[in-house]
Amino acid sequence: MQQRTPPDKLIDPDGQVHRGRFTASVPRINGPEYDYRTPMGRPAPARQRRFHYKQFQYFGLVSDELLLGCALADTAWLGVAFFYWFEPATGALHEYSWRSPLARQPHLSQSPVNGVSRFRQKGVDIRMGYESRTDGLRKSLAVELPELQLQAYMDEPADFDPMSICTRTGINGWTYANKVAGLPVQGRLTRAGQTRQLDDLNAGGHHDFSAGYMRRRTFWNWACLSGHTDGHWLGLNVSCGVNETSFTENCFWRDNELIKVDLVDFDYDGDDLMRPWRIRSGDARVDLVFEPLNRHREKLNLVLFASNFHQIFGRFTGVLRDARGRETRVDGLHGFVEEQYAQW
């Protein structure tokens, strides 16, 4: 599909959503201004407009020595934040989760290019920042816990091509996703009086900014890697279950160049997610095996809200191919896969 120049706002003055794949990030995701309808075509009542709109943002870091992930989500029914870090050499996993009824926290930025998202409760302060600069865009993460402080950021050069896409979701909804991977991460992590410079880890970063009127019952698989190999910076973002109507978010980056990918199949054992996964695209541009090392889980089953979420971290091996058939070997790069079910 031909890319479109992004509008200033995702929802136009008539309440209609701009769909398609955009050449850059849409500056403002004004989702609540959408003319949301019932499946029968009538204007949706205010309660549905409020509780059917979902937002989540994620910042991940990947390296041989350290992996970490942080997410902020506003499901309207519940606000959620999680943060974890994992050391492959020792197998040590440190996890933190927080919840806020009726999503009183977090407060999420409506822009993937300028703004701050924040989750704050007693003993925790998390901020995700978005800052347009003369030389590109900076995305940052700051985490303040009693025993840990993190400051991290990744810079998108002005010529970087993010995956910026908005697709239909059911008869009356849509999903906007802004994805980035394969960029170096800088900053520092301080714990127990010891400071680790992220610059020294040769770490790669991933970021996800998603919002929309998503399906009431949603399932997806997702895979991401980010790192430096064979003289190239690589990033991968592929999924199934969301953003597949008319076009997809599937792609990988090599040295800041976005290479589009066809539909992707996730082949794995649903009874044992810690067994190897096979991830292949229909156009053969992605052919990877994922070996799990550990995982972060969130499970909640309430009357109106349910979540069964597995984010698994491990190593990818295989090959990525561009449109001209040039291969980049992937040999043990760290990354993530997900299995997610949500009733929200």
Where are these regions (language model features)?
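Structured soluble/peripheral alpha/beta segments that form catalytic or ligand/cofactor-binding pockets
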Residues: 1-344
